[in-house]
Amino acid sequence: MFQLTDIPRLLPEILLLVLALLVLGSDILERWGRTPEAQLERVKSSASLTAIGLGMVLVVALLQSGYLYQLPETAPVNFFTNIIRNLQSGGPGGDPIIGVFATDHLTMIARLLIIGAALVTSLLCLDIRPNAHPGEFYALIIFATLGMCLMVGANELLLAYLAIELTSIPLYLLAGYFRNDPRSAEAGLKYFLFGAISSAILLYGMSLAFGAALNAVGGATNFNDLTRFDRIGAFTGSSGGLLTLAMLFIVAGMGYKLAVVPFHGWSPDVYEGSPTPITAFISTASKAAGFILLFRLLTETFPAMAGAPTLNEEAGGWTAVLAVLALLTVVIGNLAALPQTNVKRLLAYSSIAHAGFVLLGLLAWAAAQPFDREQGLIALLYYLIIYSLTNLGAFGALALIGQQTGGDDLDHLRGLSRRNLPLALLFTVCILSLAGIPPLGGFFAKFYIFMAGWQSGATWLVVIAVVMTIVSLYYYLRLLKAMFIEPARDEAPVSMPRGIGAALTIAVIGVLVLGIFPNLILSVLERV
């Protein structure tokens, strides 16, 4: 039953909903202006309101979590301490709200990551000129953020599905937002069609899980109930077969959402055709939310079916399925990136390959020791944080290059260091982090992920992943060669607007600091 004391626990989600409606409302009130100057002011107003609002929601979520500051019990009572005390009353812990939404440490950390990614995306969009209704563009970003926050805390099958749809529908619209651009229109249509198929597959898997529970114990959609029934061996005979089939359909449906091979066909075209800041948002926040929901679905709904990703007679379960998907994803993602000449398409295949690395963190659930399982989850979260910062920076730099040079092919990077050295250096840090070069965050993220895979028994997969990491150096170094060695195709300087400059700086500082001082974030992740 919902109680008033649950409201503080949902405060970030409530604020996101209010912010989305506020952005829409403010845009409607300003629609009386039809001149180009009035249209420009509407864009600036919607963009600024979104960025400031997301920044405030991020501060609220950070204070609520207690990770930055925990109010002492002996603190004096005044106006400010009362605000912080009320905020932190909704901090990590407690039973799931009405049994369907968990506010544990995993939700808190993922919520901060998603809102932070949305904030950086809104900064990247400051110089985008949407169509006649800019408020809709920014409101869609906020609604998608709200859906992702609900995804990571979902503790029930129906809420998980609704949260996925609340995330997906705004992203379909954002991908195809520039209708006059054929590539954007194609991206939106393709994203919608593949997304609809994946949603159908996922919903069918969830219905099979409910059917298995209905056949065995009278029905259940709550993760905790399904976990309890699974562990006591309630799913036997036909119920066990239904549950296995449900697991396969759920993995396939989530595989589409996460662009895991062989469900990745939509990803390169959608990444290439979408507005570049939206591509950054899809490849980071959306993927992070998807992987965390997949972790909850598999470890909380099918814990007894984990199996092992080894090459001996113990192999089986969903970890073996994920191991095969990780192998295909890492190999095909990296090999397909080698011949690419369009940088957005190259980074799309790079993102596919990185999804394979993240799957290695999930395999640690097969480890015999609980400590190793915990380390696997920490490695997965650390990887998602570093990957999100790095990809936001890389796509943000590419968005600026595309605006200034008129394209995002490899040729448009040529001589960038002579046209804007700070931009080239910021882009270089992101590329080197994606490649896993020390001492950047990408190196330690891959190291922890490889350790998690090794502890799970998938040593064969770790070896292949290391080899593919070396292969990836080729296409990443091609980008650096174009920026620093090849002659410029145009000598005109490339300017860096303040919004994109701020977003890139935030991302690069995060990659550097969390790489050189990983304990700053690992000490927080250990609470999960």
Swiss-Prot record:
Record GO terms (molecular function): NADH dehydrogenase (ubiquinone) activity; NADH:ubiquinone reductase (non-electrogenic) activity; quinone binding
Listed GO CC annotations: plasma membrane
Gene giving rise to this polypeptide: nuoN
Residues spanning the membrane: 10-30, 49-69, 106-126, 139-159, 192-212, 232-252, 275-295, 318-338, 346-366, 377-397, 424-444, 457-477, 502-522
EC category: translocase
Compartment list: Cell membrane
Family matches, as InterPro entries: NADH-Q_OxRdtase_suN/2, ND/Mrp_TM
GO annotation, biological process: ATP synthesis coupled electron transport
Subunit structure: NDH-1 is composed of 14 different subunits. Subunits NuoA, H, J, K, L, M, N constitute the membrane sector of the complex.
Main location: membrane
Function: NDH-1 shuttles electrons from NADH, via FMN and iron-sulfur (Fe-S) centers, to quinones in the respiratory chain. The immediate electron acceptor for the enzyme in this species is believed to be ubiquinone. Couples the redox reaction to proton translocation (for every two electrons transferred, four hydrogen ions are translocated across the cytoplasmic membrane), and thus conserves the redox energy in a proton gradient.
NCBIfam families found in the cross-reference section: NDH_I_N
Keyword Nucleotide-binding: no
Name listed for the protein in its UniProt record: NADH-quinone oxidoreductase subunit N
Recorded catalytic activity of this chain's protein: a quinone + NADH + 5 H(+)(in) = a quinol + NAD(+) + 4 H(+)(out)
Domain of life: Bacteria
Organism: Chloroflexus aurantiacus (strain ATCC 29364 / DSM 637 / Y-400-fl)
Family: Belongs to the complex I subunit 2 family.
Pfam families assigned to the protein according to its UniProt record, in alphabetical order: Proton_antipo_M (PF00361)
